[in-house]
Each structure stands twice: as structure tokens, then as C-alpha cells.
């Protein structure tokens, strides 16, 4: 199987943050026997992320994104994954409850903007994130081109 990593964040693209996640992801893929063919970094722009994901789905079986699934307006990975996989972005009350529970577990109240994290591509499988508040997810391409696994970015 061919794998690809897509690192998302303008701060990564411009060198303002060191990309430590890509190295860990590359090592983890190697350890489970997946061949990493490409690693791309793209800024926080829905159109460009969608373009990168479409190319990745054309040439790889497993795409792992890191970044852009937080609560701010520049966190547009969810929509870009939905676009690239041919799915609608839908609101999940279950995910909203999970995000709220995560905040309660760390003694904080969930802010209104954190509800953005309850959007997910239709049919995607939510994945737990024990380290943060952003729900991760796995989305299968509607056309059968591959899967996209979306993980949080560099803190």
C-alpha cells in the first residue's frame, strides 16, 4: 500500500513552527509496513488543501492529514476532506457531546467555537483523540480511490 502525509498549516509552510508530527507519522507508517511515497505541506486554504488531497487520493491508498481540525476559522481540513472525498460535511451531535465531555474532563467549559469540531464528512468514522479536543476521523473516498485519516496538527 502507498501512503502519503499531508501536513496542514500556514505556520508550517512558512517555517514558523517546526514540523515534528511528520517525522513521527513517517516512522509510524514505516513501523506498520506502509510505504510512504509523498509528504506535502500546504497552508490553511480550503481550495489548496482540496487540490492536494485530490492529487493524494489519485496516487496513494492511505492519506494521513495532520492539522486544521481545530475550532478556529482557519481550520478548514474537515471541509477540504469532504470536498476531496465527494462527501457532504455534516454536523454530529454525538461528536459535539464528545468534545464537551473532553472539556469537562479537563475542568473547562467548551466555548461556542468548539462546536465547529463536531462537523465531519458524511459517513466518516470518528476516531478518539486522547491528547486533545479535536475529534480525529477516517473518511473513505466515495469513488473508491483511498482513505483519508485526519489527525490534529502540531500544538
Segments predicted by a language model, with ranges:
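An anion/phosphate-binding loop that grips the pyrophosphate of nucleotide cofactors and donors
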Residues: 60
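Proline/glycine-rich low-complexity loops and linkers
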Residues: 76-155
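Glycine-rich beta-strand-to-loop/alpha-helix junction loops that act as flexible
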Residues: 8-10, 65-73, 152-153
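Short beta->alpha junction loops
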Residues: 38-48
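Short catalytic-loop micro-motif centered on adjacent basic/acidic residues
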Residues: 38-40, 65, 150
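Glycine-rich phosphate/diphosphate-binding loop of Rossmann-like nucleotide-binding domains
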Residues: 1-39
